[in-house]
C-alpha cells in the first residue's frame, strides 16, 4: 500500500476506502488480514488515527523508516485488521542491514519486519 505523499485530504479519502472495503470483505474472515506499506503518515497523524479505527499497528513506531540513509520519520507500517481474529506478534523491527547488504541502497525506505504466530486451526 502506498498512500498519497502530498495531500492529507487524499490520504483521508484513501483510508476511508481501505477501511470500508477491507471491513466489508474480511469482517467474517477466519484468518488474520494484514496491511503493509508506505503510508506517508507519522505515528501521531490523523491518517494513522483513522486507520486505527479498523486496524492495529503491529510494527514499531518509535524509530525511523525514511529516508533510509538517515531515517528520521516513521512512515512505513504493518497493521492487522480488527476482525476478531488474533495472532501473536513474535517480533517486529525496522531492518537496517540484512543478508543482501545495506538496506539504504535498496530503497529510500527501510524495510519493516513482522514475525507472527498464526492461530491454530480449529
List where the protein language model places each region:
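Catalytic metal-binding/acid-base residues of hydrolase active sites
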Residues: 2-4, 39-42
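Metal-dependent phosphoester-hydrolase catalytic domains
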Residues: 9-34, 40-122
Amino acid at each position: 500500500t502506498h498512500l498519497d505523499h502530498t495531500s492529507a485530504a487524499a490520504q483521508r479519502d484513501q483510508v476511508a476506502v481501505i477501511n470500508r472495503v477491507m471491513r466489508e470483505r474480511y469482517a467474517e474472515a477466519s484468518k488474520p488480514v494484514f496491511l503493509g506499506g508506505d503510508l506517508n503518515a507519522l505515528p501521531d497523524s490523523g491518517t494513522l488515527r483513522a486507520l486505527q479505527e479498523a486496524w492495529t499497528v503491529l510494527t514499531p513506531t518509535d524509530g525511523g523508516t525514511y529516508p533510509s540513509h538517515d531515517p528520521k520519520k516513521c512512515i512505513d507500517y504493518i497493521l492487522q485488521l480488527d476482525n476478531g481474529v488474533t495472532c501473536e506478534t513474535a517480533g517486529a523491527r525496522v531492518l537496517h542491514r540484512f543478508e543482501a547488504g545495506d538496506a539504504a541502497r535498496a530503497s529510500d525506505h527501510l524495510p519493516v519486519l513482522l514475525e507472527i504466530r498464526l492461530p491454530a486451526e480449529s
